[in-house]
């Protein structure tokens, strides 16, 4: 039993944040997956989190993000650069990872999504390059059950590609988002389920309005026994043109081990479907 718990906690630590441990194994999840949820993402970052989110809004948007490890130790070290765009459900993204060995990882991601009357579905194809060749697929969906409640999920790593000698196993990620005070405030939860491990993520966010809108988010990741594995907190400022910063720490809150700076520009073409 203890061995199973140890395996689960180790997997959560690996997938939670792109730290030095990730670099040593030369595989890293996209930074957005460490602080967003599959039922509450509505911009190009949905390409990495839940491709169905690409169809929630009828807009054209672009984003970019820089992530560093160990920001509390001097200037930190650049680990990941990612960027992408979404044009009404058609999206493309690129991720570049810098590993300790000096090797560079490249991930190209293409997504397509559509939706109607609260239902959105999407698919994304990932091409892995940089010392490896692999192809994987994600399928995602979301549905507005009630004005304040959205449910959805993702089947990730279909095809189980091998990326730099590490197989990416099929993962089921169900989730839900509740908006008790309207669209400004959200409470989200999702799980990551594989045949051998289980983890949860709980998050809250708030997005203000006005001349200079400000936003805040927080997320806690746990293992299947609800023991803390990682924590993230973020702040943003702006409306259609927005910038933000996210800082992550291990579950014991011993200090920041990753941070990222992101920018997003959106041009809305119509009402959102959610």
What are these regions (language model features)?
Residues 1-30, 254-258, 266-274:
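Cleavable N-terminal export/targeting peptides
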Residues 21-88, 259, 266:
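N-terminal, post-signal peptide beta-strand-biased segments of exported outer-membrane/organellar beta-barrel
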Residues 27-30, 91-182, 187-191, 274:
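Outer-membrane pore/translocation modules
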Residues 32, 37-40, 65-69, 95-99, ...:
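Outer-membrane beta-barrel pore domains and translocons
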Residues 43, 73-77, 102-104, 131-133, ...:
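Short sequence motifs at beta-strands and strand-loop junctions characteristic
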Residues 48, 80-82, 107-111, 138-140, ...:
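Membrane-embedded beta-strand positions in outer-membrane beta-barrel channels/transporters
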Residues 57-61, 87-89, 114-120, 146-148, ...:
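Strand-connecting loop/turn motifs
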Residues 152, 162-274:
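Outer membrane beta-barrel transmembrane domains
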């Amino acid at each position: 039993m203890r061995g199973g718990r140890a395996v689960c906690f180790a997997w959560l630590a690996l997938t939670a944040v792109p730290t030095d441990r990730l670099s040593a194994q030369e595989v890293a999840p996209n930074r957005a997956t460490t602080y967003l949820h599959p039922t509450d993402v509505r911009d190009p970052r949905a390409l990495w989190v839940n491709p169905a989110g690409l169809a929630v809004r009828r807009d054209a948007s672009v984003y970019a993000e820089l992530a560093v490890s160990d920001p509390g130790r001097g200037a930190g070290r650049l680990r990941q650069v990612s960027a992408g765009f979404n044009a009404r459900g058609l999206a493309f993204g690129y991720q570049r990872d810098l590993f300790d060995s000096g090797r560079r990882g490249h991930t190209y991601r293409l997504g397509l999504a559509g939706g109607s009357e609260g239902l959105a579905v999407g698919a994304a194809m990932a091409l892995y390059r940089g010392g490896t060749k692999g192809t994987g697929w994600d399928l995602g969906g979301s549905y507005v059950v009630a004005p304040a409640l959205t449910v959805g999920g993702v089947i990730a790593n279909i095809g189980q590609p091998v990326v730099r000698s590490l197989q990416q196993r099929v993962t089921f990620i169900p989730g839900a988002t509740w908006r008790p005070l309207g669209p400004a405030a959200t409470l989200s939860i999702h799980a990551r389920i594989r045949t051998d491990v289980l983890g949860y993520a709980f998050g809250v966010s708030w997005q203000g309005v006005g001349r200079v809108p400000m936003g805040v988010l927080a997320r806690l990741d746990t293992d299947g026994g609800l023991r803390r594995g990682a924590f993230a907190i973020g702040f943003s400022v702006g409306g259609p043109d927005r910038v933000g910063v996210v800082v992550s720490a291990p579950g014991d809150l011993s200090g920041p081990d990753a941070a990222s700076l992101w920018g997003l520009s959106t041009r809305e073409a119509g009402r959102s479907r959610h």
